[in-house]
């Protein structure tokens, strides 16, 4: 099957068909372009969605801690990667399919134009040959008619007796001329006819089949290219399926990582105040004044005039003594302490404890007149909320447990900063010693400002650590005292409750809080431990000497080539490493002279 033999007379049809093929190719390229735009918009919308639901975190406190939140953010990360794969699909289609189609369409147009021009030229040449043959034919036909006319004229004059001999001779010459011209045109016509037939045969059996064959091959290549683009279109999607599957697996793993028990524990860690729950309501004895007698020697408090105390006067005194919740006590009233509840007043010399009337009377009036202490954390939340004001430096606006955590975090950060400054100070001192011993390496005085700044930073950090440790000890001391107070007697419980607000809010008055000594755990502060050199430093790795080192300078350690030493301190940037022999001798060696191997758990420490 060949277009050149089967479609030898369908030049115009082939022209239209090849144009349709290129148009179809461009139409498919337009389809791919729109699909690319869809993929790009889809990826862009996914990224915007991830950006919208992944909040910007300005501090560590805003980082997600709950496993459900972490899982959601992991899902967002996987979705972001998924959006990246959609972009990969779009890029692959744009490069491998759309770009290839547009280049191939341009090449097809050029090739088709060239083949059609060759066909038109061949047809024009054949038409020119036919025109020449037709002109020679017409000329031969005309000359033949003229020769026939000349012959008829000659025969007429030759048969005419009246014609002169000159006229006959002239007619004969005219006949011979026309006959000769007719013969020449006949030969010309025969030659043109033979030439046209040859060109026509060549046109329809050689030139046109060759051109049509090229058009056929061009169209078949176009079809093959479309098939390849169809396959590439699908391959662009199939290539990212494994990565997309990993993204989906990551989402599933994120879903499996959700731990409800851990989230519940985080809620406890985040909102635990450290307060004890409110205690039981004490028994309110309204009949105690009935049995009170003036002759009772154990009740040695101030006696009331009239000898009898009514409920109104009792309520009035109770309201006057509720200074923890409203009014402030008079200066002459001593603060109430648990030890003042009991007095030792043996009338006959025997040792026994009796209740003093004023504390008991005070507590009973508190019970009868004070606002009932309903177990509610509304006041706690209101008292400790950060929205009530700016955060204080000692975190006293927080509940004890949260305050302790914040202070501990700050102490840890300050200790890390102190360690960094101490390392820098040590490195500067080493560099200063090197400069003093080798002045050509640098000026020791140039390091003095940096050393002074480092010392100031160390002093400042130590003061901050000491201050925060004092606050931490205060919090721990309060927590211990309040915990012990829960196990006291009912009377002691009443006094303790008298130091709390009606709604259970916490008061931090130094004159009202019975504080125990700070909890000492028998450990020194961290910056004290940093300067203790009683114990040898642990080895963090080992090294092998590449070159020998004499170690004449003070503080250095001589070594031989190939000798193995212990590393007890890394190079701080000054070019020296602290090493130790097996016999315990320590010193500094040049870092470039040794091959260092550090333990994995000691790197970066």
UniProtKB/Swiss-Prot annotation:
Region span, Interaction with DAAM1, DIAPH1 and DIAPH2: 541-605
Domain SH3: 538-599
One CC-aspect GO term: cytosol
Chain coiled-coil ranges: 66-258, 392-484
Membrane topology according to the record: Peripheral membrane protein
Record GO biological process: autophagy; cell differentiation; cilium assembly; clathrin-dependent endocytosis; membrane invagination; nervous system development; plasma membrane tubulation; positive regulation of filopodium assembly
Residue spans of biased composition, Basic and acidic residues class: 480-490
Single GO term (MF): GTPase binding
Alphabetic keyword roster: Autophagy, Cell membrane, Coiled coil, Cytoplasm, Cytoplasmic vesicle, Cytoskeleton, Developmental protein, Differentiation, Endocytosis, Lipid-binding, Membrane, Neurogenesis, Phosphoprotein, SH3 domain
Domain REM-1: 397-474
Signal peptide extent: none
Alphabetical list of PROSITE patterns matching this protein: F_BAR, REM_1, SH3
Start-end of Acidic residues biased regions: 527-536
Domain F-BAR: residue ranges: 1-263
Modified residues (Phosphoserine): 295, 488, 501, 505
UniProt-listed PANTHER family: FCH AND DOUBLE SH3 DOMAINS PROTEIN (PTHR15735), FORMIN-BINDING PROTEIN 1-LIKE (PTHR15735:SF14)
Family of this protein: Belongs to the FNBP1 family.
Domain note: The F-BAR domain binds the phospholipid membrane with its concave surface. The end-to-end polymerization of dimers of these domains provides a curved surface that fits best membranes with around 600 A diameter, and may drive tubulation.
Protein name, UniProt field: Formin-binding protein 1-like
């Amino acid at each position: 099957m060949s277009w050149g033999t089967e479609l030898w007379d369908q030049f115009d049809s082939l022209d239209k068909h090849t144009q349709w093929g290129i148009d179809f190719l461009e139409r498919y390229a337009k389809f791919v372009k729109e699909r690319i735009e869809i993929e790009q918009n889809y990826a862009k919308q996914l990224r915007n969605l991830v950006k919208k639901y992944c909040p910007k975190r300005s501090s560590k406190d805003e980082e997600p801690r709950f496993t459900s939140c972490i899982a959601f953010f992991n899902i967002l990360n996987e979705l972001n990667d998924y959006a990246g794969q959609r972009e990969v699909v779009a890029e692959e289609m744009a490069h491998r399919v759309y770009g290839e189609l547009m280049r191939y369409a341009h090449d097809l147009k050029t090739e088709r134009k060239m083949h059609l021009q060759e066909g038109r030229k061949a047809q024009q040449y054949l038409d020119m040959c036919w025109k020449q043959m037709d002109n020679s034919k017409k000329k031969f036909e005309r000359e033949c008619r003229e020769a026939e006319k000349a012959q008829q004229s000659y025969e007429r004059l030759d048969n005419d007796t009246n014609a002169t001999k000159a006229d006959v001779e002239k007619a004969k010459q005219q006949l011979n001329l026309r006959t000769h011209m007719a013969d020449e045109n006949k030969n010309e016509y025969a030659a043109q006819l033979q030439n046209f037939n040859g060109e026509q045969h060549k046109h329809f059996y050689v030139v046109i089949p060759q051109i049509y064959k090229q058009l056929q091959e061009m169209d078949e290549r176009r079809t093959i290219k479309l098939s390849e683009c169809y396959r590439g279109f699908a391959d662009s999607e199939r290539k990212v399926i494994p990565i997309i599957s990993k993204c989906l697996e990551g989402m599933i793993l994120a879903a499996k990582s959700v731990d409800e028990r851990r989230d519940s524990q985080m809620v406890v860690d985040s909102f635990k105040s450290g307060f004890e729950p409110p205690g039981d309501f004490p028994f309110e004895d309204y009949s105690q004044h009935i049995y009170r007698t003036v002759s009772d020697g154990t009740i040695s408090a101030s006696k009331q005039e009239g000898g009898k105390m009514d409920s109104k006067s009792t309520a009035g005194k109770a309201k006057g003594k509720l200074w923890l919740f409203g009014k402030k006590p008079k200066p002459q009233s001593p603060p109430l302490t648990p030890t003042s509840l009991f007095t030792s007043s043996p009338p006959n010399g025997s040792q026994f404890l009796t209740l003093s009337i004023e504390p008991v009377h005070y507590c009973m009036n508190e019970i009868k007149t004070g606002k009932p202490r309903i177990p509610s954390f509304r006041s706690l939340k209101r008292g400790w909320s950060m929205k009530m004001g700016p955060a204080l430096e000692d975190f006293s606006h927080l509940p004890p447990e949260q305050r302790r955590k914040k202070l501990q975090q700050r102490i840890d950060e300050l200790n890390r900063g102190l360690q960094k400054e101490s390392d820098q100070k040590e490195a500067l001192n080493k560099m200063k010693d090197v400069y003093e011993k080798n002045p050509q390496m640098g000026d020791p005085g140039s390091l003095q400002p940096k050393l002074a700044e480092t010392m100031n930073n160390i002093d400042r950090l130590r003061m901050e650590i000491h201050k925060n440790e004092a606050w931490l000890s205060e919090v721990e001391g309060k927590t211990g005292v309040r915990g012990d107070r829960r196990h006291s007697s009912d009377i002691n419980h009443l006094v303790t409750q008298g130091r709390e607000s009606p709604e259970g809010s916490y008061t931090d008055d130094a004159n009202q809080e019975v504080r125990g000594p700070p909890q000492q755990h028998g450990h020194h502060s961290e910056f004290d431990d940093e300067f203790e050199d009683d114990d040898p430093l642990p080895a963090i790795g080992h090294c092998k000497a590449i070159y020998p080192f004499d170690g004449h300078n003070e503080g250095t350690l001589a070594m031989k080539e190939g000798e193995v030493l212990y590393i007890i301190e890394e190079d701080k940037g000054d070019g020296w490493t602290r090493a130790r022999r097996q016999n315990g001798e320590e010193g500094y060696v040049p870092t470039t002279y040794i091959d260092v191997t550090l333990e994995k758990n000691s790197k970066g420490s």
